[in-house]
Swiss-Prot record:
GO CC, any one term: photosystem I
Presence of the UniProt keyword Chloroplast in the record: yes
InterPro entries, alphabetized: PSI_PsaJ, PSI_PsaJ_sf
Record keyword Magnesium present: no
Encoding gene, per UniProt annotation: psaJ
Protein keywords: Chloroplast, Membrane, Photosynthesis, Photosystem I, Plastid, Thylakoid, Transmembrane, Transmembrane helix
Entry protein name: Photosystem I reaction center subunit IX
Protein topology in the membrane: Single-pass membrane protein
Amino acid sequence: MRDLKTYLSVAPVLSTLWFGALAGLLIEINRLFPDALTFPFFSF
């Protein structure tokens, strides 16, 4: 039961950090390439 409580307390923290980092990455991409439908480094 203690392991379950540890898991339930760690999962929200890790998901918050993950989604925060993902949001920051998306914000920086949109800052560098505003309104980009196709990114220059993805065009072949």
